[in-house]
């Protein structure tokens, strides 16, 4: 009798995706973040669903409904902080996942990579809208500042902003639609994740060497299921430590003050995971230029397959580009720091220099170093 997992129409799909999937035998722990992102998404959807049962998307009651969840709902504080800190863990895993793709040349799998970039944009949009929902000071002013950026678009900018707001300022209509979008987007993300995996399993995974691994593949289960399980345990451990010991470590104290349109906070800034992009936005004095730089800071990832000049896929044996890669990582940390600082000297100039070097490393220096390494290895023929 044939095994049911190989014959049943539905179980067969799961079998080919997570059990009998041929996987390179040498993929490291950097390949764990895909499954961890899946776990983060599941946690966010489940906790979000429970929060939505008690939350009210109305400007008069939104803030107090969040307080009610924390005070009166059974384990409401746990659900709320799991959701808030789960977003931070989600972005940590996302950045590490993208960083691994950049280091090991996974962007050469074009379809998978492009869906991944689209996923990154969608997750960022979802997180931004979620930050508006508690209707604290930073929620309100963050929503005002970021949506107002669209007014930089020529001709239709102002109309577009008022259309998104549903009025002449961020108000009840804005909050209601943001809640609706924040609720629906995770399910769209889930659909995109399935497409992401579909494209990945079409070509097979990359590996640290960047070489073809078809000659040496092992089944995903039990080897990588047990390896993923270790990652899952570590993620849950670190998330629960954050939630139970330092729940407000990554949030803004201003968001514990109810939204007040008449009182602007001293420093308007987004959540920590958007600070690098916010720093790039602020580094350009022109409004439209800033918006374009902001979009390009993420969209530049989609250009990576076209900027790949090396004959080698991975950075494993490319010391010059490795150095540039770690310079880029350091640069992003500097941008994250600058994004949280006030707009004054010396932070302005540091932000501008870091923004220039961010785009220079990706668009100019890395492709040049690829060509140099080819020459050094006499592979340019």
Swiss-Prot record:
Heme b b566 binds at residues 97, 196. It is a multi-pass membrane protein. It is found in: Mitochondrion inner membrane. Heme b b562 binds at residues 83, 182. Its cofactor is heme b. Keywords: Electron transport, Heme, Iron, Membrane, Metal-binding, Mitochondrion, Mitochondrion inner membrane, Respiratory chain, Transmembrane, Transmembrane helix, Transport, Ubiquinone. GO terms for biological process: mitochondrial electron transport, ubiquinol to cytochrome c. A ubiquinone binds at residue 201. One of its GO terms (molecular function) is metal ion binding. The cytochrome bc1 complex contains 11 subunits: 3 respiratory subunits (MT-CYB, CYC1 and UQCRFS1), 2 core proteins (UQCRC1 and UQCRC2) and 6 low-molecular weight proteins (UQCRH/QCR6, UQCRB/QCR7, UQCRQ/QCR8, UQCR10/QCR9, UQCR11/QCR10 and a cleavage product of UQCRFS1). This cytochrome bc1 complex then forms a dimer. This is Cytochrome b. The gene is MT-CYB.
